[in-house]
């Protein structure tokens, strides 16, 4: 039994000879984890180092609110940060110029130090993330078409199931098409009949006007006898 246990224990060299790919993956994972742990211990940022980023110099309000915010947070632990900011802004507006003067002087001193330390500093505000663009007219038309198709064919067919619904809808569509064709045919025939009637009226009036001298030449007695049945 001890022999079997001893045979199961392999050295790293034997593991590398048997499966070099697995050994390489395990070693790479070990080195990656070690480097990540080293970064966490040293406090390095993986995404971006803080050496290139330069903070803006504090203004008078920030100099004053830095200590005041701590006091308000300690006095009201349940108050949210947004509510604290509103309260600090209201209190800052109520301060007189004499009360604000020391904070303005401190801000000027910090600004001079900042200029000496970073002479080429330029404030570059961060760009705000753009909101999602609204649907274009083309996109909205495509959505409308898709909705129309979905209303006409709400079911998916499997092995010939639920085809009666499609046949009914197709029959309704064909019936509506036939009704529209029939209506257009009757409208066309009605229009043609009215045009023919108008043409016949014009022809009759022209014929009567042409025969009018002949009717005038007839004598009264002859005219009555001529038109007897």
Curated annotation (Swiss-Prot):
The record's account of how the chain is modified after translation: Acetylation of Lys-130 contributes to its nuclear localization and enhances its interaction with KPNB1. Deacetylated by HDAC3.
Pfam families named in the record: HMG_box (PF00505)
Compartment list: Nucleus speckle; Cytoplasm; Nucleus
Major localization class: nucleus
Self-association state and partner proteins as the record states: Interacts with CALM, EP300, HDAC3, KPNB1, ZNF208 isoform KRAB-O, PARP1, SLC9A3R2 and WT1. The interaction with EP300 modulates its DNA-binding activity. The interaction with KPNB1 is sensitive to dissociation by Ran in the GTP-bound form. Interaction with PARP1 impaired its DNA-binding activity.
Protein's job: Transcriptional regulator that controls a genetic switch in male development. It is necessary and sufficient for initiating male sex determination by directing the development of supporting cell precursors (pre-Sertoli cells) as Sertoli rather than granulosa cells. Involved in different aspects of gene regulation including promoter activation or repression. Binds to the DNA consensus sequence 5'-[AT]AACAA[AT]-3'. SRY HMG box recognizes DNA by partial intercalation in the minor groove and promotes DNA bending. Also involved in pre-mRNA splicing.
Family as reported in the entry's similarity comment: Belongs to the SRY family.
Protein name, UniProt field: Sex-determining region Y protein
Organism: Alces alces cameloides
Source organism phylogeny: Eukaryota, Metazoa, Chordata, Craniata, Vertebrata
């Amino acid at each position: 039994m001890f022999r079997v246990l001893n045979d199961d224990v392999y050295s790293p060299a034997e593991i590398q000879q048997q499966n070099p790919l697995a050994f390489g993956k395990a070693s790479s994972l070990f080195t990656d984890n070690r480097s990540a742990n080293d970064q966490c211990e040293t406090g390095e940022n993986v995404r971006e180092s803080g050496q290139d980023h330069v903070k803006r110099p504090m203004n008078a309000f920030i100099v004053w609110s830095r200590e005041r915010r701590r006091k308000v947070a300690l006095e009201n632990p349940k108050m949210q940060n947004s509510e604290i900011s509103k309260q600090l802004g209201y209190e800052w507006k109520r301060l007189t110029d004499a009360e604000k003067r020391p904070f303005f002087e401190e801000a000027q001193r910090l600004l001079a130090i900042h200029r000496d330390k970073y002479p080429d500093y330029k404030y570059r505000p961060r760009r705000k993330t753009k909101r999602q663009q609204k649907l274009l007219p083309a996109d909205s038309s495509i959505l409308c078409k898709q909705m129309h198709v979905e209303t006409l064919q709400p079911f998916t067919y499997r092995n010939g199931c639920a085809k009666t619904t499609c046949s009914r809808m197709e029959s309704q569509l064909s019936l509506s098409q036939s009704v529209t064709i029939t209506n257009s045919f009757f409208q066309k025939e009605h229009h043609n009949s009215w045009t023919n009637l108008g043409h016949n009226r014009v022809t009759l009036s022209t014929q009567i006007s042409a025969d009018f001298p002949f009717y005038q030449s007839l004598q009264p007695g002859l005219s009555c006898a001529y038109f007897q049945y």
